[in-house]
Amino acid sequence: MRALIKSGATVMLFCVLEDSGAKTRAAKVWKLRFEAFNANVRKIAGEVGAILLDPNQESSWRHPGFIHEDRLHLNSLGHYRVAQAVLARLNLPHDSSWRTPLPPPVKLPLGEQIKTNLRWIILYGIPWAIRRIRKKSSGDGRSPKYPAPTTWKP
Protein backbone atom coordinates (compact mmCIF):
# COMPACT_ATOMS: atom_id res chain seq x y z
CA MET A 1 0.00 0.00 0.00
CA ARG A 2 2.81 2.39 0.84
CA ALA A 3 4.37 1.70 -2.56
CA LEU A 4 1.06 2.43 -4.26
CA ILE A 5 0.72 5.74 -2.46
CA LYS A 6 4.34 6.67 -3.25
CA SER A 7 3.60 5.96 -6.92
CA GLY A 8 0.90 8.63 -6.85
CA ALA A 9 -2.06 6.25 -6.73
CA THR A 10 -5.11 7.22 -4.75
CA VAL A 11 -5.73 4.59 -2.09
CA MET A 12 -8.99 4.31 -0.20
CA LEU A 13 -9.53 2.08 2.81
CA PHE A 14 -12.93 1.03 4.11
CA CYS A 15 -14.14 0.46 7.63
CA VAL A 16 -16.96 -1.99 8.18
CA LEU A 17 -20.23 -1.11 9.85
CA GLU A 18 -19.75 -1.88 13.53
CA ASP A 19 -23.34 -1.60 14.71
CA SER A 20 -26.12 -2.81 12.43
CA GLY A 21 -28.74 -1.82 14.95
CA ALA A 22 -29.56 -5.46 15.73
CA LYS A 23 -29.89 -6.24 19.43
CA THR A 24 -28.88 -9.90 19.31
CA ARG A 25 -26.02 -11.55 21.17
CA ALA A 26 -24.31 -12.30 17.84
CA ALA A 27 -24.55 -8.62 16.86
CA LYS A 28 -22.77 -7.65 20.08
CA VAL A 29 -19.95 -10.14 19.39
CA TRP A 30 -19.55 -8.92 15.81
CA LYS A 31 -19.56 -5.30 17.01
CA LEU A 32 -16.55 -5.96 19.25
CA ARG A 33 -14.67 -7.69 16.43
CA PHE A 34 -15.52 -4.96 13.94
CA GLU A 35 -14.45 -2.22 16.36
CA ALA A 36 -11.01 -3.83 16.69
CA PHE A 37 -10.73 -4.33 12.92
CA ASN A 38 -11.75 -0.73 12.22
CA ALA A 39 -9.28 0.63 14.77
CA ASN A 40 -6.51 -0.99 12.71
CA VAL A 41 -7.94 0.29 9.41
CA ARG A 42 -8.16 3.86 10.79
CA LYS A 43 -4.62 3.66 12.16
CA ILE A 44 -3.18 2.43 8.87
CA ALA A 45 -5.12 5.02 6.84
CA GLY A 46 -3.71 7.74 9.07
CA GLU A 47 -0.16 6.39 8.88
CA VAL A 48 -0.04 6.09 5.10
CA GLY A 49 -2.30 8.98 4.12
CA ALA A 50 -5.01 6.84 2.55
CA ILE A 51 -8.52 8.16 2.10
CA LEU A 52 -10.87 6.56 4.61
CA LEU A 53 -14.51 5.68 4.06
CA ASP A 54 -16.09 5.00 7.44
CA PRO A 55 -19.81 4.17 7.46
CA ASN A 56 -19.87 4.41 11.24
CA GLN A 57 -19.96 8.19 11.00
CA GLU A 58 -23.46 8.14 9.48
CA SER A 59 -26.48 6.49 11.07
CA SER A 60 -28.20 6.01 7.69
CA TRP A 61 -25.95 3.02 6.95
CA ARG A 62 -27.64 1.03 9.71
CA HIS A 63 -30.89 0.65 7.77
CA PRO A 64 -31.65 -3.00 6.94
CA GLY A 65 -32.81 -1.92 3.47
CA PHE A 66 -29.16 -1.93 2.35
CA ILE A 67 -28.48 -5.53 3.34
CA HIS A 68 -28.92 -8.63 1.19
CA GLU A 69 -31.18 -11.36 2.52
CA ASP A 70 -28.02 -13.27 3.52
CA ARG A 71 -27.64 -10.63 6.28
CA LEU A 72 -23.96 -10.31 5.50
CA HIS A 73 -23.54 -8.52 2.18
CA LEU A 74 -24.95 -5.37 0.67
CA ASN A 75 -27.83 -5.58 -1.78
CA SER A 76 -28.01 -3.51 -5.00
CA LEU A 77 -29.18 -0.38 -3.18
CA GLY A 78 -26.42 -0.79 -0.60
CA HIS A 79 -23.78 -1.13 -3.31
CA TYR A 80 -25.17 1.93 -5.08
CA ARG A 81 -24.97 3.95 -1.87
CA VAL A 82 -21.39 2.85 -1.25
CA ALA A 83 -20.44 3.77 -4.83
CA GLN A 84 -21.95 7.23 -4.34
CA ALA A 85 -20.16 7.62 -1.00
CA VAL A 86 -16.85 6.71 -2.68
CA LEU A 87 -17.43 9.25 -5.45
CA ALA A 88 -18.37 11.91 -2.88
CA ARG A 89 -15.28 11.13 -0.78
CA LEU A 90 -13.13 11.50 -3.91
CA ASN A 91 -14.84 14.81 -4.75
CA LEU A 92 -16.13 13.39 -8.03
CA PRO A 93 -19.62 13.83 -9.51
CA HIS A 94 -22.14 11.75 -7.59
CA ASP A 95 -25.81 11.43 -6.73
CA SER A 96 -26.18 13.97 -3.93
CA SER A 97 -29.23 12.15 -2.59
CA TRP A 98 -27.17 9.15 -1.51
CA ARG A 99 -27.42 10.24 2.13
CA THR A 100 -31.21 10.51 2.06
CA PRO A 101 -32.53 8.21 4.78
CA LEU A 102 -34.79 5.35 3.78
CA PRO A 103 -38.25 5.14 5.33
CA PRO A 104 -38.34 3.15 8.58
CA PRO A 105 -38.33 -0.61 7.99
CA VAL A 106 -41.67 -2.37 8.14
CA LYS A 107 -42.07 -4.38 11.33
CA LEU A 108 -43.09 -7.90 10.32
CA PRO A 109 -45.68 -9.82 12.34
CA LEU A 110 -44.12 -12.43 14.61
CA GLY A 111 -45.12 -15.32 12.32
CA GLU A 112 -43.40 -13.65 9.35
CA GLN A 113 -40.29 -12.96 11.45
CA ILE A 114 -40.09 -16.63 12.41
CA LYS A 115 -40.63 -17.72 8.79
CA THR A 116 -37.94 -15.28 7.58
CA ASN A 117 -35.48 -16.46 10.22
CA LEU A 118 -36.10 -20.13 9.45
CA ARG A 119 -35.60 -19.44 5.74
CA TRP A 120 -32.32 -17.67 6.53
CA ILE A 121 -31.15 -20.57 8.70
CA ILE A 122 -31.88 -23.07 5.90
CA LEU A 123 -30.49 -21.02 3.01
CA TYR A 124 -27.53 -19.31 4.68
CA GLY A 125 -26.89 -20.34 8.28
CA ILE A 126 -26.61 -24.11 7.87
CA PRO A 127 -24.56 -23.95 4.63
CA TRP A 128 -22.21 -21.46 6.31
CA ALA A 129 -21.78 -23.74 9.34
CA ILE A 130 -21.08 -26.75 7.10
CA ARG A 131 -18.45 -24.77 5.15
CA ARG A 132 -16.80 -23.71 8.41
CA ILE A 133 -16.69 -27.30 9.67
CA ARG A 134 -15.17 -28.44 6.36
CA LYS A 135 -12.76 -25.46 6.36
CA LYS A 136 -14.10 -24.32 2.98
CA SER A 137 -14.89 -20.87 1.70
CA SER A 138 -17.81 -19.98 -0.52
CA GLY A 139 -15.20 -18.53 -2.86
CA ASP A 140 -13.20 -21.74 -3.22
CA GLY A 141 -12.92 -22.76 -6.86
CA ARG A 142 -14.17 -19.43 -8.20
CA SER A 143 -12.18 -17.52 -10.78
CA PRO A 144 -11.67 -13.77 -10.47
CA LYS A 145 -13.85 -11.55 -12.61
CA TYR A 146 -10.76 -9.54 -13.56
CA PRO A 147 -7.66 -11.76 -13.21
CA ALA A 148 -5.25 -8.99 -14.23
CA PRO A 149 -5.03 -5.38 -13.03
CA THR A 150 -7.56 -3.30 -14.93
CA THR A 151 -7.66 0.42 -15.57
CA TRP A 152 -11.07 2.04 -15.19
CA LYS A 153 -11.68 5.27 -17.03
CA PRO A 154 -13.73 7.91 -15.18
Locations of regions flagged by a protein language model:
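Short alpha-helix in the Rossmann-fold core of NAD(P)-dependent oxidoreductases
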Residues: M1-L4, N75
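Surface-exposed alpha-helical segments enriched in charged/polar residues
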Residues: R2, A39-K43, A88
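A short helix->loop->beta-strand "cap" motif at the edges of active sites that frequently abuts
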Residues: I5-V11, A50
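Alpha/beta-hydrolase-fold catalytic nucleophile elbow
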Residues: F14-C15
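Oxyanion-hole/transition-state-stabilizing segment in secreted/luminal serine hydrolases
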Residues: E18-D19, G125
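Substrate-gating cap/lid alpha-helix
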Residues: D19-P55, S76
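Conserved catalytic region of serine esterases and O-acyltransferases that act on ester linkages
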Residues: E47, D70-H73, L77-P154
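The feature captures the short pre-catalytic strand/loop hairpin that immediately precedes
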Residues: S59-E69
